[in-house]
Amino acid sequence: MKSRDTLIRLKKFQVDEKRRRVAQIEGMIAEFERMAADLDREIKTEQERAGIHDPAHFAYPTYAKAAMQRKENLKRSADELKVQLDDARAALGEAFEELKKVELLDERDQARERAEENAREQADMDSIGLMRARLGAIA
């Protein structure tokens, strides 16, 4: 049983690690999306300030062009992280399934041990009852 308890603790630790990884990736994606939204606002502000909204225009603000490039890089990075997130979620699901298998085996073993203990107790009680019945018949 002790080895099973250790295995359960290990599986729980693995599930927790995978949950942390999923949360970390989700946080990074959210941060990249927030930064991209901030850059979007800055681009709009710069376009309004310059009065030019066409990126192909020769006088389009350089800062707005650079901000657009950074925004695209952030979106590309967020998309790459989404692939990693899918993988991390799949790994979390697998780790959770493994944990459940081990827990079910442990529950089954405990139920079997309880049934065996109950059977032993019942046998003891039966033998006590039988002895009392014999003593009562003798007396």
Feature-to-residue mapping (PLM):
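Charge-rich amphipathic alpha-helical interaction elements
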Residues: 1-139
